[in-house]
UniProtKB/Swiss-Prot annotation:
Belongs to the UPF0763 family. HAMAP family: UPF0763. This is UPF0763 protein JJD26997_0796. It comes from Campylobacter jejuni subsp. doylei (strain ATCC BAA-1458 / RM4099 / 269.97). Pfam families: DUF2603.
């Protein structure tokens, strides 16, 4: 009875996950992993679906843990998507850091920042570990002409008010 309960719980988890992926119940492939006579071998028994069904395929092991099977191409596509998302996220964070310092010409600051980042990457620093706000502040100190000098503008406005 407990076995059936655990299996039912596994199926509910697979249902939920499949729904999130947009896989219909009839298109799901589920295997049950069983111990074979040889202790170094396991047997996969097709419980639902077919070998032509879309990935991922689900495997329920002897401990009622759920595993998935993916083709190498699918895994590669997932990793490429993650890499692209990470790149876009990094670029958005860099863009935000630049705009917070009020650049005179965004593209000039972007170019200098990317050069600095490439240099850090060559020295072994991972892009994700770079503090972008700190980097842009450093660039602002080294190249003040690339940014609007707000202090000078405020002083100029104050001088004009006195006249």
């Amino acid at each position: 009875m407990k076995e059936l309960e655990k299996y039912s719980t596994c199926l509910k988890c697979i249902d939920e996950f499949s729904q999130n992926l947009g896989i219909k119940k009839k298109d799901r492939t589920i295997f049950k992993m069983k111990q074979s006579e040889n202790e170094n071998e396991k047997c996969l028994v097709l419980e639902n679906g077919s070998f032509e069904s879309p990935e991922p395929w689900f495997v329920i092991d002897e401990n009622d843990e759920i595993h998935t099977l993916l083709s190498l191409q699918s895994l590669k596509n997932i990793l490429e998507s993650l890499k692209q998302s990470q790149k876009e996220n990094f670029e958005l964070r860099l863009e935000k850091a630049i705009y917070q310092q009020i650049p005179v010409d965004f593209n000039d600051v972007w170019t200098v920042a990317m050069d600095e980042i490439k240099q850090k990457a060559q020295n072994g620093t991972m892009e994700v570990s770079i503090d972008l706000e700190k980097l842009i502040s450093k660039i602002k100190q080294e190249h003040p002409n690339l940014f609007v000098d707000m202090q000078a503008m405020i002083e100029k406005v104050n001088q004009n008010e006195r006249l």
